[in-house]
């Protein structure tokens, strides 16, 4: 298994593993916070409404290891809890993360793919916005391939938003790399990098807090929906 833990300020593969970002005490405190969420909270995108999550986002933003990868004006715009378990298990085919949460719909020829999820507006972001964004996945449990961890297509973020033909070319001709993360690790990734995951075959839980950071200002009159 390759070692993806070495920091790289240009993130050429489109992702970077940072080991042991959370110590045991902080990780257990976060697990305790999650235990107080209502049933069915996994998959919800509004965790930044919670004060503890806002504080965690600020702590992440200021981590020295993240500074080379964040836009100078980066703000946290979303946090989602993903949880795989024997009762809640799924696979995800290779894809890019293209939708962003915004405060309201804006009619502009450059904007498409509008949707409403959980009562909030989402739009397919312009490529120049996505290129400046960073996702930070905080692992509260191990996320090996047996736990349904992520696989990446190396360097695929460099081609911007991919159409179906380009996606097939990348899948056929570029390396697909599995990343095993341990509890407490942080996995950084560009939303434009092709990534996928399989169903978990292990019997434990795989809880991940998926933070999204983006530039403070958006084009075309868009504004972030923070939360």
Per-segment meaning from a language model:
Residues 2-5, 10-13, 22-183, 196, ...:
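Non-heme Fe(II) oxygenase catalytic core, chiefly the N-lobe of the double-stranded beta-helix
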